[in-house]
Each structure stands twice: as C-alpha cells, then as structure tokens.
C-alpha cells in the first residue's frame, strides 16, 4: 500500500439555500463559534474542537444545492441534556436517543435538511 498523501481533513461543508438562516442555526442555536463571514461570497465558517464547518449558499455560487445523507456527528458530553436544550430552542429530533453499545446518538437536521447527530462515545476505542 502506498503512503498516504492525505494529512487530514481541513473542513466539512454543508449547503444552504439561506445563508443568514444557517448562520443563525449554527451560531445561535448550536452555539458554534463563527470564524469567517463573507456575505459577498455567500460563505461562512464555524469552529468546534478540531473541525471547521463551512456553510455555503451553493445556488448563489452557481452550484446545485444538495442535501447529503451522511451525518455530521457533533460531540457532546451528555446527549440527552444537549437534546433537551436544543428541543427548547425548537430543534426537532428523529426518534429517541439511542445506545449503540459504544455511544449515545440523537439525530436531527439543520433548516436545510442536512443530517446532524449529537454524539457521545462512552466505550473505549479498541
């Protein structure tokens, strides 16, 4: 196997049809720190831990808006408590908090339908 030239993941991007609404959701509702805001480029970035989350208004950039099926798992200390707080802010979850045997998860979407997950791993990595 060849040595990987991939050094890491620089950012994860989600598409929006309304940049200001997405900024309110990721910044105000989820409490992520906004690090970049370029309204003239229809673009914003948020920071959490070692991840940069980019939010782009794809259609205004000449790209197709698409919602992907892969969840972005957001690490929290207590999934149930974080879910309760977000529900109080109007976020709707799909199903109950579930236990996989190694972690707790709760699924929801952003206002554009991008799938997100509250996640807490309690079992050690093998």
Predicted regions and their residues:
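Amphipathic alpha-helical segments
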Residues: 20-34
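Conserved short beta-strand elements that form part of the metal-binding/catalytic scaffold
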Residues: 33-67, 115-121
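Short secondary-structure junctions
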Residues: 31-37, 93-97
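Vicinal oxygen chelate
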Residues: 1-5, 83, 87-126
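N-terminal beta-strand motif that seeds the catalytic metal site of vicinal oxygen chelate
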Residues: 1-21, 70-74, 122-126
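Residue-level marker for the onset of beta-strands and adjacent loop->beta junctions
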Residues: 10, 40-42, 70, 82, ...
């Amino acid at each position: 196997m060849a040595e990987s030239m991939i050094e890491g993941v620089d950012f994860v991007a989600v598409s929006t049809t309304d940049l200001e609404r997405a900024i309110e959701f990721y910044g105000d509702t989820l409490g992520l720190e906004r690090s970049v805001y370029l309204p003239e480029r229809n673009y914003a970035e948020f920071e959490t831990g070692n991840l940069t989350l980019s939010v782009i208004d794809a259609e205004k950039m000449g790209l197709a808006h698409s919602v992907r099926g892969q969840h972005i798992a957001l690490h929290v200390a207590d999934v149930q408590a974080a879910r309760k707080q977000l529900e109080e802010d109007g976020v709707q979850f799909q199903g109950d908090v579930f236990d996989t045997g190694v972690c707790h998860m709760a699924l929801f979407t952003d206002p554009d339908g991008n799938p997100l997950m509250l996640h807490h791993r309690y079992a050690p990595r093998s």
